[in-house]
């Protein structure tokens, strides 16, 4: 199999959606990588320099407004309202929200360690696992979120939940979870999304569309942090992205125009209100 063969094959996929083309290409490349590992072929033709890897058609993120976040939060049943705080205030993914424990929170230093998620294995079997990308990270704990967690725990004490680790039948692992179901189990997205999240959206008048899933809270966190001047590198670390470049590509349109920042910076030096320097006869200032 030659790189030119891959190039020709990719041309036959030109009419498919960019994201789907990328998924198909990635799957084929994975097969070739396995063949290389098994010494069946010398090289992966998909990784040749002449082969242009398909790119996803990234849609521009339109972050929720503060008013929408608060409205959806208030429409969630009281038992599940903390979901909004964890998503919009900490930038957690849904599985990480479901797996957060008070043991992960340092209330003294104001820091949260994101070290597990609840994920589904083989359809509906719940397991604990590392966060996406197998990447444990630390996230700052804002005072408002800390207050919400503290108040929530006085009404809903954390509960110990045991799940297999990473795979069905994996080593049983117990964590004290902040959020649990009425049956005292870990929250399951197959129940939470259709029966808790979407009804809240409906009551607020938010369209039940993919971009309005729980991930919208995470986008709100990122857009708010960037708007307030946080760096892409820091936001990338808080979100658990493996590549800051991905964070930049996803959220760059939400960042303040660099030209405006530059103009303000120069105006602060040479503008009407800037102090004038005194030039001496020898040319010094």
Where do the model's predicted regions map?
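C-terminal secondary-structure termini that scaffold catalytic or DNA-interacting sites
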Residues: 74, 109, 120-145, 150-151, ...
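Basic, Lys/Arg- and aromatic-enriched nucleic-acid-binding interface segment
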Residues: 18-26, 35-100, 108, 119-120, ...
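Short, basic (Lys/Arg/His-rich) helix/loop patches that form interaction surfaces
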Residues: 18, 71-81, 90, 139, ...
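Short, polar N-cap/turn motifs at the start of nucleic acid-interacting alpha helices
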Residues: 104-111, 230-252, 260
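N-terminal core-binding DNA-recognition domain of tyrosine site-specific recombinases/integrases
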Residues: 1-40, 58, 185-193, 206-216
């Amino acid at each position: 199999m030659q790189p030119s063969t891959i190039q020709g094959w990719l041309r036959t996929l030109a009419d498919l959606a960019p994201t789907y083309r990328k998924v198909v290409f990635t799957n084929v490349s994975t097969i070739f990588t396995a063949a290389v590992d098994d010494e069946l072929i010398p090289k992966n033709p998909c990784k040749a320099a002449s082969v242009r890897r398909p790119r996803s058609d990234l849609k521009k993120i339109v972050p929720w407004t503060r008013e929408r976040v608060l409205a959806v939060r208030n429409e969630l049943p009281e038992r599940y309202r903390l979901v909004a705080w964890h998503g919009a205030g900490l930038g957690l993914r849904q599985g990480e929200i479901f797996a957060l424990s008070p043991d992960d929170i340092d209330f003294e230093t104001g820091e949260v360690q994101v070290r597990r998620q609840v994920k589904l294995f083989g359809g509906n079997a719940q397991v604990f696992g590392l966060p996406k990308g197998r990447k444990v990270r630390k996230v700052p704990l804002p005072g408002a979120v800390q207050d919400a967690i503290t108040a929530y725990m006085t009404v809903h004490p954390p509960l110990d939940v045991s799940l297999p680790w990473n795979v069905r039948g994996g080593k049983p692992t117990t964590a004290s979870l902040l959020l649990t179901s009425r049956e005292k189990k870990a929250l399951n997205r197959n129940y939470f999304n259709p029966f808790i999240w979407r009804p809240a959206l409906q009551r607020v008048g938010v369209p039940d569309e993919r971009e309005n899933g729980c991930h919208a809270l995470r986008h709100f966190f990122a857009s708010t942090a960037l708007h307030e001047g946080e760096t892409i590198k820091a936001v990338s670390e808080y979100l658990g992205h493996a590549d800051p470049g991905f964070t930049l590509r996803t959220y760059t349109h939400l960042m303040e125009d660099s030209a405006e920042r530059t103009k303000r910076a120069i105006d602060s030096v040479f503008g009407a209100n800037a102090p004038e320097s005194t030039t001496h006869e020898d040319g010094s200032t």
